[in-house]
Every structure is written in structure tokens, then in C-alpha cells.
């Protein structure tokens, strides 16, 4: 069985493909990955589940019942986190305020390998002590250390189990993948799946794990992601007792010691190119009955000059924009037919351009909260008699940067009050009538909230408001605050560039119109909003009749996630596209020949330099290194260049030699020693030089590291006085190291 995973910033989905040898029948042996809730096992999640992670111990009953079955480890579950709806419910109902119990999405924090400051906690209250227990549980506590590193990688004398759980946020990805692996292993061998897919008597084994990656993910993060997947495999195999606990797991020979074969890991395809394959396959097979030539001929643009030596009408240039929850990705792929005839034609893809920005749906949600929800709350407070409502909101929901009980309450307020309100506004906008200029949302906070916030959150807000109200005034009811929005005003604001999503969309559409594409595919949940659709139509990167909106796109019954013959949620196209890629490699798609091996990802880091503090732009005078190529074996940086520093900086990159092109943060260069900081604050200037790590004749470089540093007068600086750390959190609006969903700071002055 092959498992295909698309781990997103907001949602994750998976597809399972079984290989029955000679009995294969196209796409019949596929199933969606379904995550079962462990606290209420009668419930299954939707195939598209949220990426939120919460610590929670899996309890299946007392241990001595397990012994009666003849196995003492029948109740072992190799993971201590939950994902999906169960994690969301646990986060919504959480009462404790002592430390964090979860995170909005581990993929956002792959870069952060520093141990956490506070211990992680399970998010249920323990009966006897009435406190939340620390997040350690058998079997994983004996397989990793306090920082979340697997013990089999450490030298023998350093192998200590978990005492205080301070796992770094990057290792939470390992925890999440452990949980998904455990669920997948349970599903492929469950009775229902075996009966449905045929051959109910044969046991199933995982053969490959295929992960799709966003275009916006830099090479360094990609390597960390591969590492986390490998660690999760090792931990699950050791926790289930399939591999000796203390043995190493790195080489294929050591992996052969395990009782159950270890699956291979594959990460080559990016999400945007995979999404195109779904459209290509469906058009060729369903609409043109397998006649690929007439399909290419019908859609090729007559006004684009063909390249020399290419017959007109035998090539197609497809662009796709994928606006997800955390990243906006775009790819332009050129598809070429070889000289076959009829259905016996092979399609060869060639990736022309790809780009990704870390601004997407969640930033749109924050904009909605700041434009609509908070101003109406502020007006209601002023009407009730609060003299300085702005200051009150800033202390309650602003960015104080402290980690204390108040910070946890602030994060829970964002999760339980503001995010549901923001989602309600967005879904009303999505379903509104485009032709009605007066369409809007007129309701109170209480009408829009399906589930009321917990008493802790209500007390936190209520006490602060009661203090600020003049004495003798009636109590303020937050559920009666009116919310009045006109959608036409939102759309005008989006077109005028007052939302953060507008800039990346402008950049992407500019690139697409430069390449004269034949078709533009638009996928992702935020593209269902009338405002976003209006913006793309207004920019018109291709003629409007050549834009395909994937949420309304009709697919036939072959599509695993289809709802009433349509792609219900366009997020699933990446996983299904990767499934088609994988089947095409084994020639398991009848009447559709596709050379999938050619869609490789390339690194988009071309220009590296210091980012501006306020907005993510990289000005030409701030560029340090030009024309970097991280895919070339033996690549090096120019050793003659060195750069002056006057404080902590953020290094970012962009792909094009154009200062308007949005840049993405990559590293933080910070000064550790207090003495060095004093010298620089005086009149010293620090000079720094970078180099590439892991570059040799055969292998391309992996990442940047500090080469050396010295002061103006030539004194060398010790290596530990400076740190160059990965930090790819997109926006300077977030307090340095936390995304707004995890810090709860939604109010900006």
C-alpha cells in the first residue's frame, strides 16, 4: 500500500493506493485516509482534516485487560498527539492555563529547533489532581529525550528518556506524523477497508510514503521535513516493537532487522504541479475520451508564437494558482506531446517557473478580524461608556509579547471567539449573491457563534470590561454586540490593496501574463470568495474564458474526494495529483501516458540579502549575494564578499531581479554576547561572511552557515557570539516567533 500525504498549514489529507499486482484496475483500488477520533472512536473525521495538533494521551482501558488477551501491549498507541476534529475540540474545551497543550500547525514551525521554554501539557484535566498532566506517556517517552530528539541518534551515554517535556516546535511535526502513520496502519488492515478493496484475507503493508511539498518551502525546510518523516517512521516501528529499541535505523541494512518491512520516503513533487495533473487527466479521459491530440489542439492559444521546431497545437502551457491556508503557490508547466498518434501519445511536462509566498487564507482571516470584528466591538464598548476602548482592546488582545497565563487566555480567546466570528463572515461572503450591491451580514456576535467560549475566556474578557465601565452602568453583554458588514465594501478594499493578499496575487498574475499561458487553474479555499475572484478577473492574466475555477469543476466518479460530481474542497487536488503521478510511474493509468519523473522541484533562492523591517521587500542595495544556485553540485559563494552589520537582521530571498517582487524571510542573524552588542552599539561595525554547507562534487549544498566574523579594527569574533538561525515565519506583524493563531495577538494599533 502506498500512502500519499499532503500536509498543509491548515488542512491535511491523505490517499491510500493498493497494488494488487495483475488484478490492478486503474483508480479502483484507492481510498481516502480517515482519521478516527480516539476519545469517541465511533466518529471518523472528514477526509480533509485540520492540521491542528493537541497533546492528549490515548487511553483504551486498564492494562491488565490487555494481558488477558495473551499480549501485554495490545493497548499501546505509538503517539501522544491528536490531529483533526478531535484536536480542535480539545483546544476549544481546554480549561488549564499553565502551559501550551498544542499548536496551530507544525509545518509553520519546522524551522524552530530550540527547546520550548515551558513544559508541554496534556489538554485534559486529570481527575485526582485537578491539574493538567505533563505531556509524556509510554511508549514514546522511552524513545526520545526532553527536546524531542530520538534516542537512537544520540551517543549511548546521552540517551536519557523524557523527564520534562520541552520538545522543540519542529519536533511536533514528528509527533503529528507518528499519529497519522498509526491511523494509516490501523486503517489499511481494518476489516471494512479489506472487504471494500478486495482480497480480504491478505494482510496489508506500507510500501512507500509520498509527501507533496508547497512551492514556497525552501530547500533547508524541505530537508528538515524529510528528517521528521524518517524519525516518525523509526519511532512508530520501535514503539510497536517491530524494530529493536536501541539499534540504529539509518542504513538500509539496519532497517532490515525489523519484523515489518520499512516503507520508502519520497518527496519530489510540488503541490501546484500535482494539482494541474488532476485537470489534465480529467479533461483528456472524460471530456476528450482519451484523444490527447485533439484536446491539446482545441485549447492551444492561436496568438502565441510556437517555439522553433515545435509543431503548433502539440504543446500546452498551463499555469496554476493555489491559495491555501498558509501559502500561495504558483507553477507554470509546459506540456509537450511526442510524435505518437491517437491514444498512443506520451505527455512530457517541463516546469518553466514556480513561486510561493507565505501570505494566504489565514492572513485573510486576520484582515477580516481586524477590519470587521474588532471595530464593531470597539464601537459597542464606547457606546456602553468605556472612555478609552482602544487601550482596553490593546491590553486584552494586543501584542504584549509576554508568556504568562494571560497570554494563554489571549490565545484561547482568539481560538474560541474571534476565529469562529471571522470564519462566519467569510462563509457568509462566500455564499452571498454577487449581483446584489447591498448584500451583507447583519447579526450579533451571539447569533454567529455555534459554541459559546469556555467560562475562563468569558471571565477574562468580562472582568477587564467591568473594570473599565463607569460605576452603576449595566453589565456589558459581548454576545449582543452587533456586526454589520457590506460585502461590496470588502471587495473594494481587496481590489484597492488594503488586504495583505493583494500584493502576492498581483506579482503572480504579472508572471503568468508574461508567459502567455493557455489555461489558468485556480484552486484553494479562499478562491471561492467573490472578492478574490473579482481581483483575479480584474488582473486578467489570461482571457477570462480560459480561467478554470477548480471548486466548481466537474469531475467524474474516478475522483476519490468528489461531492455530487464536483471537487468539493479544492485542497484535495494536490494529494490526488500526486496519486496520479505515482500511478503513472507504474504505468497503471490506462489510455493516459504521462512522464511523471520530469516534474522536479528546484530551489527558488536566487538573491539573498537583508529584508526591510516593516514590509517583506528586498531592496537592490540590500542584496548580499546574487545568482545563487542551490541545485548545482559544488556550488560556492563568493568568498571575497563580506557585509557590515549594525544589529540583529532578518535575511530573506527572492527569485527575480526585480525589487518589486515580494521577498520571503529565511534566516535570523542575531548577536548573542552582551559585550559584542555593547561594542556595536558604540561605534563598532561588525563584518560577516557566509558560506554554503554540504557542497561537494556530487551533492548540491544544503544550507547557509556563518563562515567568519570580525570587527572593524580586524579583531576576530568568536563563533558562538553570533547565531544564524532558520526563521521562515512570514510576517513581521507577528511577534518574532509566534504566528497570530498561536499568540492570540489580533489587535494592532
Regions found by a protein language model. Give the residues of each.
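Long C-terminal appendages of very large multidomain proteins
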Residues: 619-738, 745
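Conserved phosphate-binding catalytic cores of ATP/NTP-utilizing and phosphoryl-transfer enzymes
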Residues: 1, 242-318, 587
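Conserved phosphate-binding loops in N-terminal lobes of ATP-dependent enzymes
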Residues: 53-212, 749
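Gly/Thr-rich phosphate-binding beta-strand-loop-beta motif of the actin/hexokinase/Hsp70
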Residues: 1-24, 126-146, 284-344, 522, ...
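Glycine-rich phosphate-binding/hydrolytic loop that grips phosphoryl groups
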Residues: 263-285, 366-367, 548-606
Amino acid at each position: 500500500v502506498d500512502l500519499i500525504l499532503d500536509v498543509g498549514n491548515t488542512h491535511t489529507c491523505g490517499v491510500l493506493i493498493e497494488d494488487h499486482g495483475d488484478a490492478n484496475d486503474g483508480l479502483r483500488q484507492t481510498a481516502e485516509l480517515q482519521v478516527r477520533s480516539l476519545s469517541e472512536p465511533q466518529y471518523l473525521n472528514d477526509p480533509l482534516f485540520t492540521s491542528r495538533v493537541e497533546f492528549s494521551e490515548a487511553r483504551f482501558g486498564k492494562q491488565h485487560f490487555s494481558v488477558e488477551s495473551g499480549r501485554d501491549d495490545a493497548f499501546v498507541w505509538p503517539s501522544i498527539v491528536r490531529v483533526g476534529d478531535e484536536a480542535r475540540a480539545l483546544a476549544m474545551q481546554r480549561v488549564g492555563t499553565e502551559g501550551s497543550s498544542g499548536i496551530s500547525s507544525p509545518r509553520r514551525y519546522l524551522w524552530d529547533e530550540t527547546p520550548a521554554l515551558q513544559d508541554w501539557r496534556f489538554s485534559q484535566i486529570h481527575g485526582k489532581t485537578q491539574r493538567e498532566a505533563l505531556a509524556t506517556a509510554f511508549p514514546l517517552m522511552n524513545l526520545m529525550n526532553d527536546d524531542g530528539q530520538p534516542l537512537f541518534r544520540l551517543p549511548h551515554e546521552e540517551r536519557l528518556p523524557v523527564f520534562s517535556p520541552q520538545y522543540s516546535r519542529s519536533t511536533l511535526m514528528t509527533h503529528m506524523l507518528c499519529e497519522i502513520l498509526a491511523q494509516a496502519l490501523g486503517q489499511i488492515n481494518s476489516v471494512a477497508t479489506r472487504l471494500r478493496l478486495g482480497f480480504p484475507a491478505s494482510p496489508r503493508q506500507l510500501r512507500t510514503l509520498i509527501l507533496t511539498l508547497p512551492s514556497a518551502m525552501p530547500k533547508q525546510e524541505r530537508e528538515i521535513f524529510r528528517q521528521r518523516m524518517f524519525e516518525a517512521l523509526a519511532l512508530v516501528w520501535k514503539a510497536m516493537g517491530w524494530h529493536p529499541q536501541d539499534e540504529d535505523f539509518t542504513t538500509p541494512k539496519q532497517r532490515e532487522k525489523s519484523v515489518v518491512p520499512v516503507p520508502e520516503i519520497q518527496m519530489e513533487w510540488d503541490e501546484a504541479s500535482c494539482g494541474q495533473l488532476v485537470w489534465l487527466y480529467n479533461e483528456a479521459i472524460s471530456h476528450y475520451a482519451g484523444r490527447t491530440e485533439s484536446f491539446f489542439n482545441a485549447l492551444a492559444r492561436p496568438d502565441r508564437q510556437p517555439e522553433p521546431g515545435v509543431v503548433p497545437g502539440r504543446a500546452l502551457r498551463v499555469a496554476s494558482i493555489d491559495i491555501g491556508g498558509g501559502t500561495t503557490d504558483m507553477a507554470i508547466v509546459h506540456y509537450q506531446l511526442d510524435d505518437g498518434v491517437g491514444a498512443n501519445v506520451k505527455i512530457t511536462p517541463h516546469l518553466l517557473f514556480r513561486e510561493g509566498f507565505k501570505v494566504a487564507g489565514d492572513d485573510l482571516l486576520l484582515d477580516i478580524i481586524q477590519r470587521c470584528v474588532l471595530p464593531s466591538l470597539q464601537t459597542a464598548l464606547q457606546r456602553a461608556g468605556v472612555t478609552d476602548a482602544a487601550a482596553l482592546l490593546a491590553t486584552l488582545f494586543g501584542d504584549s509579547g509576554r508568556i504568562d497565563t494571560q497570554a494563554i487566555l489571549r490565545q484561547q480567546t482568539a481560538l474560541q471567539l474571534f476565529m469562529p466570528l471571522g470564519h462566519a463572515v467569510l462563509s457568509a461572503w462566500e455564499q452571498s449573491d454577487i449581483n446584489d450591491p447591498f448584500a451583507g451580514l447583519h447579526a450579533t456576535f451571539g447569533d454567529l457563534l455555534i459554541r459559546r467560549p469556555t467560562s475562563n475566556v468569558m471571565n477574562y474578557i468580562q472582568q477587564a470590561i467591568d473594570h473599565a465601565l463607569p460605576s452603576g452602568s449595566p453589565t456589558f453583554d459581548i454576545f449582543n454586540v452587533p456586526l454589520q458588514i457590506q460585502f461590496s465594501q470588502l471587495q473594494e478594499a481587496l481590489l484597492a490593496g488594503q488586504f495583505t493578499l493583494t500584493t502576492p496575487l498581483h506579482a503572480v498574475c504579472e508572471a503568468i501574463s508574461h508567459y502567455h499561458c493557455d489555461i489558468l487553474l485556480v484552486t484553494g479555499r479562499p478562491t471561492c470568495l467573490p472578492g478574490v475572484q473579482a481581483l483575479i478577473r480584474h488582473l486578467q492574466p489570461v482571457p477570462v474564458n480560459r480561467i478554470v475555477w477548480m471548486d466548481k469543476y466537474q469531475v467524474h466518479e474516478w475522483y476519490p474526494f468528489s461531492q455530487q460530481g464536483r471537487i468539493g474542497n479544492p485542497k484535495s487536488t494536490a494529494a490526488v495529483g500526486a496519486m496520479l503521478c505515482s500511478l503513472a510511474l507504474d504505468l497503471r493509468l490506462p489510455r493516459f501516458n504521462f512522464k511523471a519523473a520530469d516534474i522536479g522541484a528546484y530551489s527558488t533562492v536566487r538573491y539573498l540579502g537583508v529584508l526591510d523591517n516593516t514590509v517583506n521587500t528586498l531592496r537592490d542595495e540590500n542584496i548580499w549575494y546574487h545568482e545563487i544556485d542551490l541545485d548545482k553540485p559544488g556550488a560556492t559563494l563568493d568568498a571575497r564578499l563580506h557585509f557590515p552589520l549594525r544589529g540583529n537582521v532578518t535575511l530573506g530571498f527572492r527569485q527575480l531581479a526585480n525589487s518589486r517582487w515580494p521577498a520571503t524571510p529565511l534566516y535570523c542573524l542575531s548577536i548573542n554576547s552582551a559585550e559584542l552588542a555593547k561594542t556595536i552599539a558604540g561605534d563598532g561595525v561588525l563584518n560577516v561572511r557566509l558560506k554554503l554547507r554540504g557542497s561537494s562534487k556530487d551533492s548540491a549544498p544544503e544550507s547557509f552557515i556563518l563562515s567568519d566574523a570580525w570587527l572593524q579594527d580586524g579583531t576576530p569574533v568568536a563563533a558562538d557570539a553570533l547565531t544564524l538561525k532558520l526563521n521562515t515565519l512570514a510576517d513581521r506583524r507577528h511577534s518574532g516567533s509566534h504566528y497570530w493563531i498561536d499568540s492570540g495577538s489580533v489587535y494592532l494599533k
